[in-house]
Amino acid sequence: MNALIGLLALSGCASLSGSKDQFFVCSYDVVWSAALESVKDRPIQVQDKDKGLIETDWIEMEGTERSYGAFEREAFGNRERARMTVAVKRLNDVTSVSVLENRQRWHLKGGISQESTKWWPIDPSEEAEATVVNRLNRKLKEKGCLAS
């Protein structure tokens, strides 16, 4: 029971705010490799095994909202961009993994000022996060790792 309480206390330090967190009974090296493979469809910007940090570069895509304002006008493009951050941490007998997507939309605010024409944060895509988490789970299951 004390081990479980200790694990839960440590998990708060090991996760990213708002992330999808999981714990695996598996070696750090195996989980690290699986985490890296799980985001291989995106360009990697940071890959620091010692710190347990993987960050992808921004990828741009068509936005989900098409118009704005009372007249439902097109703004300065309908673009979104996203990047993934994966944190892998050693915790006693388990390894934790936190997956978080940062997503932004171009020019959602009205006006023509410099302040209105920039990337604005929006909610992450649960589907994109789930895709990475499911890939990770599948890869670790193939290697015999147990989720705890």
What is the role of each PLM region?
Residues 14-148:
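Ser/Thr-rich, low-complexity intrinsically disordered terminal regions
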Residues 1-13:
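Sec-dependent bacterial lipoprotein signal peptides
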